[in-house]
Amino acid sequence: MVSSLASNIILALVVVLMTLLRQNKPLQRWFVSYVEKLLSRKSNLAQKVSVLSPSLKLVDVEKSISADQSNLSKINYQIPTLPDLTGNLIRLHEYRARGEGYNGLLFRRARQLNGISEDQLQKLGYFTKLMKNNEGIRENARVIDKIIEFTLGKLIHSNEHDEEFTEEIEKICAEHGYKIKDGHLIQLNPDFVFPIVSSRGSQSVVHEALAHLCRDFSSYYSVERDPLQNFIISRINHHVISAGDMKEKILIVTPGAGVGGLSHTLATTFPKIQVDSIELSALMYICNLFALEYKHDVKIRPFVQQYSCQTVFDNQLRSLSADLSKVGHRSNLDPLWGDFTRYSPISKDYDKIIICSAYFIDTAENMFEYLSSIEALKKYCKELHWVNVGPLKYGTKPLVQFTGDELSRLRKIRGWKDLVEEYEVDSSKGLNGYLTDYESMYQGYYGLLKFHSVFES
């Protein structure tokens, strides 16, 4: 009875408030402004919480940072914030709804055809194909659920002793259908389909991150990885490391690390050398941590939403295994999240630092900023090497677009000495695919620019 009375009173107050807001424009403007300020204040508070990598430990940037948080000094400023992390978790969680929504659009378009055409589509099994495609999307979504659950679990574990962030972390978990009990995640409704809550942001970056898990860790894509890794490893083995001498203090840095395949291979190949990998994309970085720590293989359907140039539907729907059981975290590997141009090592007494870049330099909006950031590492070592392999396919609104020859001459102007420079552009000898579907009617390949330079200025 009391509960019912209280509910009626609250309802009456809400009705009165809504009536006042409709009739009183100044009050309406004040109320909207007040709500916006509350939301803005909450957003600003979250913006002041930084995420340290690779632990995902949260820190208030306005408070002093304890000395044991050493990786903070590797990314000097513009450290990723909590909204950077949570916004991309939402992007991941929207994958199923957006994917099935697109298939629904294809279904509705086909239904616009006349009766004869629709009857022929039924005989072809076209609508059945779209339904089966939804099943493929759901299987990918289950992998994404594992990535989200892993990330939330890591966030909880790394901040379990920081009560100031407990409420915020509980809220983040609840948004994704979890609650925290005794320090562990419990899924509230496994069948819940996460709705589309953000109108901004493309799902192409989610598809790309999933596909990169295959490219970096599936045997299917070893044909793409091996030429890159073999060149880099060969240069380090034969032209950087002194024969039989591992007493030198050496650091390998891999900018634009993606989901971490190259950096993990280098850390495994050279277990006595520290490897720092840096990745700017939150989605790629989340998948990088997942790959290093999940310890189980996952099956991904990387072509499920690629309708063009397919020979048969089974090829579009086929799965690849990302062999994460063979990965495992390496003690000499530090995967960092942030802008490479804000990176600097902790130690200043390295004998050699080796920049290992693959499919990286053409991502620069400002090539000179990339070059300056690489050259700035010279003050941390006696000898600075740069081993690069990849095309020059410019994107991201570049300020300059150099030819290979111009880039070579620019290196010389800036004080680099090339130990080797070569091109692979002969299609008869094999070019390099990049997330290529080798069963498709469209297969893209790149020529490669390979160089190994030493900075002498």
Curated annotation (Swiss-Prot):
UniProt superkingdom: Eukaryota
Parts of the chain that traverse the membrane: 1-21, 250-270
Keywords: Membrane, Transmembrane, Transmembrane helix
One annotated Gene Ontology cellular component of this protein: membrane
One Gene Ontology term of the molecular function aspect: S-adenosylmethionine-dependent methyltransferase activity
Subcellular location: Membrane
Membrane topology: Multi-pass membrane protein
Pfam family, one: CARME
Note: Present with 981 molecules/cell in log phase SD medium.
Annotated protein name in UniProt: Uncharacterized protein YMR209C
